Curated annotation (Swiss-Prot):
Tagged with keyword Transmembrane: no
Family: Belongs to the MraZ family.
InterPro entries in alphabetical order: MraZ (IPR003444), MraZ_C (IPR035644), MraZ_dom (IPR020603), MraZ_N (IPR035642), MraZ_sf (IPR038619), SpoVT-AbrB_dom (IPR007159), SpoVT-AbrB_sf (IPR037914)
GO cellular component entries: cytoplasm; nucleoid
Membrane-traversing stretches: none
NCBIfam families noted in UniProt: division/cell wall cluster transcriptional repressor MraZ (TIGR00242)
UniProt KW keywords: Cytoplasm, DNA-binding, Repeat, Repressor, Transcription, Transcription regulation
Molecular function per GO: DNA-binding transcription factor activity; transcription cis-regulatory region binding
Source superkingdom: Bacteria
One protein family per Pfam: MraZ
Protein name: Transcriptional regulator MraZ
Compartments (UniProt record): Cytoplasm, Nucleoid
Record organism: Salmonella typhimurium (strain LT2 / SGSC1412 / ATCC 700720)
Originating gene: mraZ
Residue ranges annotated for the SpoVT-AbrB domain, each copy included: 5-52, 81-124
Length: 152
């Protein structure tokens, strides 16, 4: 399980160094093999260990290519999916088209989200956090049952 937000830097070749605390888990669970794709709702990337991505691919394969909405989701997620292998120094090369989609230049937030990471431009990440907090403070909608049961 991945959690927490960590500032990492992209080098001049577009590689980011995975924080040490995640490396062993990624090597054990995925032999360092990762898949990166776009997030279809936010200007960030999704970074999955390969076994987790394969579960997503199976679910995507069950969608109908005849349904325009389902086909669009397949096209966006699979069409942007890029395999990346963690090297001996714990670095991952993020494809240029993916970096461009998320506006990643130098400083990147690596955000743990259970079975995957999100990769955000640092400035965009903090803007999103502020928007999310503001939305929660002014929320008028009713909490779902699952959120009502969540006690923090």
């Amino acid at each position: 399980m991945f959690r927490g937000a960590t500032l990492v830097n992209l080098d001049s070749k577009g590689r980011l160094t995975v924080p040490t605390r995640y490396r062993e888990q990624l090597i054990e669970s995925a032999t360092g093999q990762m898949v990166c794709t776009i997030d279809i709702h936010h200007p960030c990337l999704l970074l999955y260990p390969l076994p987790e991505w394969e579960i997503i691919e199976q679910k995507l394969s069950r969608l109908s290519s005849m349904n325009p909405v389902e086909r669009r989701v397949q096209r966006l997620l699979l069409g942007h999916a890029s395999e990346c292998q963690m090297d001996g120094a714990g670095r991952l090369l993020i494809a240029p088209v993916l970096r461009q989609h998320a506006g990643l230049t130098k400083e990147v937030m690596l955000v743990g989200q259970f079975n995957k990471f999100e990769l955000w431009d640092e400035t965009t990440w903090y803007q999103q956090v502020k928007e999310d907090i503001d939305a929660e403070q002014s929320a008028t909608e009713t909490l779902s049952e699952r959120l009502q049961d969540l006690s923090l």
